[in-house]
Amino acid sequence: EFRRVLFRSSAASLPIINRMGGDQAAWIKVTLIYSVVAIGLLLWGFFGTKERVNTQAAQEAEKLPASVRFGALIHNKYFLMILFASLFLAVYQTVNGTVATYYAQYILGNNEYYSVLNLAENIPQVVVIMILAPFIKKFGKRNLVLAGAILTMVAQLTLLAVPANPAFVAAVAAIRGIGKAPLFGCVFTMMADVVNYGHWKTGVRVQALIFSAATVGQKFGGGITGAIIGQLMDKSGFTGLAQEIPSAVAMVENLYIWGTVFAWAIII
């Protein structure tokens, strides 16, 4: 139910902004509305949720010195892998979320195509996540994530041949949704596997540190990527006006295509 609400709000955002004038004030108003709703939902979740599972191993780990817990974390090679996967997943989400609007406007010719691309990518993703279980049992989480990452990269590279056809770009977005579904569907269970592996290898269960570090990695990746995108757009001469100079349009196209390829190449 929440996913359907997310789809509808994402698809409706740009049309609503355009109907409200399409200027900075319209963006601020819509963002403010979403922010108020988000704060309310977060507070609801915080005050309405109670953790009922607390293993003895986790309790004992919390009593250990920080140096011991961080040592167990660093010596867990799979933690570093999942950390980088989480970080560059955030890189992809930032690139796609930031640049896709400009790609729709300056490459496809209408910024409302962003809503179409968003739906085209997210609907297949959710469908695939819902049916992942039997494939995980047969092929394993790692193999599915690798196959999905390769599929996403290959699909994105086809945009080099046909970058400005809305139907083709939407089809590529749908394939991206299928490709990224295994990682989105498995990332948190893979973190749990990392916790169990670390406990087996070191005798120290540091689940709080692992999940916290992965979350920090996501925030760091998204923040740094956003700053880099801003710098590159500025250097290209991007102004945000209805008409952009060729260098700015080329930067939008390159970021949209190669940013995704780069992120998923690192994940692999």
Which role fits each region the language model picked out?
Residues 202-236:
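A late C-terminal transmembrane helix in Major Facilitator Superfamily
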Residues 8-25, 223-249:
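Transmembrane alpha-helix termini and helix-breaking/packing motifs in multi-pass membrane transporters
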Residues 34, 116-125, 218, 263:
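Transmembrane alpha-helical segments of major facilitator superfamily
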Residues 122-130, 181, 223:
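Residue-level signature of mid-helix packing/kink "hotspots" within the transmembrane helices
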Residues 1-101, 105-110, 255, 260-268:
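Intracellular loop-helix junctions on the cytosolic face of multi-pass helical membrane proteins
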Residues 17, 127-141:
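Helix-to-loop junctions at the C-terminal end of transmembrane segments
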Residues 160-173, 184:
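Helix-loop junctions at membrane interfaces in 12-TM secondary transporters
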Residues 143-158:
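Structural signature of the two symmetry-related core transmembrane helices
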